[in-house]
Amino acid sequence: MFKKIIASLLCALALQGCMAFIAGAAIGGVVVFEGRNWRQQNIDNRITVEAEKKLNADEELHNSSRIIVSSYNGDLLLAGQAPTPLLKQRAEEDLRYVPGVKRVYNEISIGGPISTLTESSDAWVTTKIKTEMLANANLRSSSIKVITENGTVFLMGMVTKTQGSIAADIARESSVVQRVVTLFSYKSDGTKVVH
């Protein structure tokens, strides 16, 4: 019951514009409880910064595309929109050799940038899913990164197959989610990661 009350309060805060509070709490929780060690977290942060720098340095990509990047355990997710398949591929090629990147998931769609309203909806969906995961006693939600882009939810992290299934089910329950993409590294015995 207590977890449901906390989850409801977090949702209410998010709807009132307190996203910075929730994001700060979520980021703080990730640092303390997630499955990556501090070294890997640092590598992932550097991957994200370097990838964003490279995208911004490519003038054509920067001016015509909307691309977001997220790194977890060396896996780099590219999502967003590019006007042509050529630019989609170029973004991947530009970022494939960023130091620390093990694998690139290119989920960029072809088309124009999404609206601010859609971006806001995506942020709300991410907050809602993270809150529901936090309220689930069977899930270590701090080991899962949730990214929502144009109604598609991407789940990244190091989890067991059971936890991955629970997380995907929670994400699918949202009525506005069009698709759920799981990009997990699975732990077979609690420590070993199977890609």
Model-derived features with residue positions:
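N-terminal targeting leaders
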Residues: F2-K3, L9-L10, G17-H195
